[in-house]
């Protein structure tokens, strides 16, 4: 009897430890997750295995300071896709055909507003799609870097939450610390990755978005307190990776998804 009790106690403690470990490793629920859209039936039907990442935005053109970071972010997106079993064609395969089509239909981007003429965009994409059939591509992936706005919470812990991520404030410049009168409710610029996936019929099969990082920091040189553009934009690779995972969920499953399953 004592041996049985010891065994039972051991199994109970082991089970409890495993449960606590599982709970501690689970992502904290974040209500700010983006409401993704996925056509699962079409995804299953298309059996997407080979993709190409477009060098252009699907929506409004990114801000200049984000556009400069786009090739680096696309490279990380490509690596993530390959890790998950996808074949990623070189971006130049898309870019060369896109540029040729632009010469026929004109640039769909209005330089004065940054908005995209969807009629021209559709004509160009139809041409690109037709010319890329022999490459074996199954889907086109658009990766738009968006500038949004968020604010830090009040209280003892100041964090900003948007598109599934939680970020702490960063400081920039010499100073003695954040003023006690600093307005934590002031809006600051943040960046997110928006992913849109279209199949060979140019039907959208997935749309998602994941937060990346704040693109502004607290200016320590300001006595009143203000935000300034960060010198290094999206330099934290861990934050970028998190945003990529969130942007692709559930097209690519992730244990780090902080929303409801």
Protein language model features and the residues they cover:
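N-terminal segment of the mature soluble domain
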Residues: 60-150, 192, 198, 202-207
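Charge-rich, low-complexity terminal tails
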Residues: 56-60, 71, 253-261
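Bacterial N-terminal signal peptides
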Residues: 10-21
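C-terminal/domain-edge helix-coil "capping" segments
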Residues: 23-49, 147-261
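Alpha-helix termination/capping residues and helix-transition junctions
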Residues: 17, 45, 134-137
């Amino acid at each position: 009897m004592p041996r049985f009790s010891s065994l039972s106690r051991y199994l109970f403690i082991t089970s409890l430890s495993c449960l606590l470990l599982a709970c501690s490793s689970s992502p904290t629920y974040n209500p700010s997750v983006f409401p993704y859209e996925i056509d699962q039936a079409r995804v299953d039907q298309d059996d997407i295995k080979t993709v190409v990442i477009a060098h252009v935005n699907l929506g409004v053109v990114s801000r200049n300071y984000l556009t400069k970071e786009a090739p680096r972010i696309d490279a990380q997106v490509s690596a993530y896709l390959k890790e998950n079993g996808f074949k990623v064609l070189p971006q130049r395969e898309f870019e060369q055909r896109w540029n040729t089509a632009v010469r026929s239909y004109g640039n769909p981007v209005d330089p004065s507003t940054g908005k995209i003429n969807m009629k021209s965009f559709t004509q160009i994409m139809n041409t690109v799609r037709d010319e890329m059939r022999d490459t074996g591509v199954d889907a086109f992936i658009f990766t738009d870097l968006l500038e949004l706005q968020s604010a830090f919470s009040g209280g003892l812990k100041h964090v900003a939450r948007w598109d599934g991520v939680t970020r702490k404030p960063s400081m920039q410049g010499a100073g003695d610390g954040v003023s006690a009168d600093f307005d934590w409710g002031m809006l600051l610029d943040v960046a997110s990755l928006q992913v849109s996936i279209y199949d060979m019929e140019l039907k959208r099969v997935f749309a998602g978005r994941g937060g990346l990082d704040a693109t502004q920091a607290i200016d320590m040189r300001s006595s009143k307190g203000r935000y300034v553009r960060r010198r290094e934009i999206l330099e934290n690779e861990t934050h970028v990776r998190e945003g990529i995972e969130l942007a692709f969920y559930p097209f690519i499953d992730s244990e780090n998804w902080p929303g409801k399953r």
